[in-house]
Amino acid sequence: MVVGKIIKISGPVVVAEGMKGSQMFEVVKVGNEGLTGEIIQLTEDEAIIQVYEETAGIKPGEGVEGTGAPLSVELGPGMLKAMYDGIQRPLNEIENATDSIYIPRGVSVPSISRDIKWDFEATAAVGDEVITGDVIGTVQETASIVHKIMIPLGISGKIKEIKSGSFTVEETVAVVETAEGEKEVQMMQKWPVRKPRPSKGKQPPVIPLITGQRVEDTFFGVAKGGAAAIPGPFGSGKTVTQHQLAKWSDVDVVVYIGCGERGNEMTEVIEEFPHLDDIKTGNKLMDRTVLIANTSNMPVAAREASVYTGITIAEYFRDQGLGVLLTADSTSRWAEAMREISGRLEEMPGEEGYPAYLSSKLAQFYERAGRVQCLGSEDKHGFVCIVGAVSPPGGDFSEPVTSNTLRIVKVFWALDANLARRRHFPAINWLTSYSLYIDDIAGWWQENTAADWRSLRDEAMTLLQKEAELQEIVQLVGPDALPDRERVILEIARMLREDFLQQDAYHEVDSYCSPLKQYNMLKIIMTYYTKALDAVAKGADPAGISAVTVKGDIARMKYLTDDEFINTKVPEIINKMESELGALIK
């Protein structure tokens, strides 16, 4: 084991000598208190270490001890419902062990409890041939998730021993006879966070991730296994949007990373999620959630670790054939941590002081998203979908973190402070946002809703763009100077904005909107548009069209349950629309 000595300390960056024999990204214990750090640079016998804990009080001359292993996470039953810090230390366990609401420096608590016994049910039998990724048994970890125990990387052969029963994560549940001899398999495995977990190959992203948010699903959909960015200035609703995604997304597991954001926002997640029901299983949302809390007052170096810890945990659940959503709030804080450490290392700064390797670091993270065919002899498919919030100072989307993120992700949900000030939520600007997955996922929508979904969606987008062009004229001469047809376009665009795009995150029905309800709502508004244009062409007054009472029914449809709306209200609204608009024709 390499033992060196501290010669320089600069904030979270420590320089140690006598480190010959160390490896890049090796975890080391720094100082007399044994603070956790990671080697990020090696020169001759000197190592530069980023320390994941507060360095106040340590001094030159104290020891640095290598562990011989890279920064790794423990993967196994017990991760769901847990809350970790950036280097996978369980916060609840630390509080119980130290009787303190603060994390003491140098504290070491196992990431996964070694005392809890899990009921392991073997699905493989003695004599079965197994390879890496094969499922040999299951554990009912929470009411929502059955945790699959897999053969770790590098083991393949014939099962010599396996039995069902209650085991801790360190006890042997199976013995595999391999070419190199007998290998024991436990329920827990370790994986280095910077190394992507392997798969057989990536699959095309053709299935949409249903989030229940109309503007995201219908207009700017993200595919399962895709990557999306939510940039927006302060107060535009990034965190509420992330919370909505974590609550309602059509996934099996959610990994929520609070990376350098306010502690109150993590508190909100912890307080809310245990009381909310998962629409897929009917169980509590917390049963399928892993929280990684790395708030703004925690050491900056741990922000990078929290992002890699989160994506590695997400890939592990993906390898079980599950769908995982990873939300990172916010990647800008991670980039700021990189900038701070780069400054301490006296590296050549890039644009706005960020390091020159900013774009490659972001790409390494987002490229770990994807829908894959999992390792193993059975046909398993899983996906990781990444949604990263970006907090550009002053809402400037041309700044380096936002512009580099846009080069990597295929979905851009641009939050607009002006919409937020007008109380339009989600404040996603339909003119600047985009999705490059629409062509890929249109087939699923047409199969699961109706064949005209794509044409309705494109026509609605065209109307919203046309409204933006007409607004300039309206501000100069007023709406009454416009031709009748264009006055109808303005009215329909207003209905699209207020009755379709706006959504109440705190309303028990409107908080989540199913794909079929989304389609029917859009169909009604676009049917109204077609019939209103027809009525105007036959001599109806646009003022009369704007005054029909069916518009009140259209405005209220978002608050109706799926059953009531689709089975009862849709035909009623269309019949009422036809009779009221028909009565206006002279």
UniProtKB/Swiss-Prot annotation:
Keywords: ATP synthesis, ATP-binding, Cell membrane, Hydrogen ion transport, Ion transport, Membrane, Nucleotide-binding, Translocase, Transport. The gene is atpA. One of its GO terms (molecular function) is proton-transporting ATP synthase activity, rotational mechanism. Component of the A-type ATP synthase that produces ATP from ADP in the presence of a proton gradient across the membrane. The A chain is the catalytic subunit. The keyword Cell membrane applies. The lineage of its organism: Archaea, Methanobacteriati, Methanobacteriota, Methanomada group, Methanococci. InterPro entries: ATP-synt_VA_C, ATP-synth_a_Xtn, ATP_synth_asu-like_sf, ATP_synth_asu_arc, ATPase_a/bsu_AS, ATPase_F1/V1/A1_a/bsu_N, ATPase_F1/V1/A1_a/bsu_N_sf, ATPase_F1/V1/A1_a/bsu_nucl-bd. Has multiple subunits with at least A(3), B(3), C, D, E, F, H, I and proteolipid K(x). It comes from the Archaea. It is an enzyme of class 7 (translocase). It is a peripheral membrane protein. GO terms for biological process: proton motive force-driven plasma membrane ATP synthesis. This is A-type ATP synthase subunit A. It comes from Methanococcus maripaludis (strain C5 / ATCC BAA-1333). GO terms for cellular component: plasma membrane; proton-transporting two-sector ATPase complex, catalytic domain. It is found in: Cell membrane.
